[in-house]
């Protein structure tokens, strides 16, 4: 994974997954449900972060996930697989 510094003299263009090739979001697995909830609590406090949704069941559970965007606009998903 390589992250590049953006040229701030040009306006940012929102990503459209239907018309552009690129990163839609990055999913990261957490080990336990408690870690997911603790991560959500920490993320809520970060300046500039937009939470798309708090931890919620995924496909009827027991898996849970949350989605948020970091200040640069990259969407991140944290997922607990329902085991451990």
Predicted regions and their residues:
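Conserved short beta-strand elements that form part of the metal-binding/catalytic scaffold
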Residues: 1-20, 69, 75-80
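Short linear functional motifs in flexible/disordered or boundary regions
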Residues: 15, 38-39, 84
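Short beta-strand segments enriched in hydrophobic/aromatic residues
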Residues: 30, 80-82
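A short acidic/small-residue loop/turn micro-motif
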Residues: 59, 82-84
């Amino acid at each position: 994974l390589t992250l590049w510094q953006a040229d701030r003299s040009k306006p940012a263009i929102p990503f459209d997954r239907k018309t552009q090739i690129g990163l839609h979001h990055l999913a990261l697995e957490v080990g336990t449900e408690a870690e997911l909830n603790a991560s959500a609590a920490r993320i809520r406090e970060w300046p500039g972060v937009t939470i798309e949704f708090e931890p919620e069941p995924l496909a009827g559970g027991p898996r849970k996930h949350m989605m948020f965007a970091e200040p640069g606009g990259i969407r991140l998903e944290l997922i607990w697989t329902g085991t451990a």
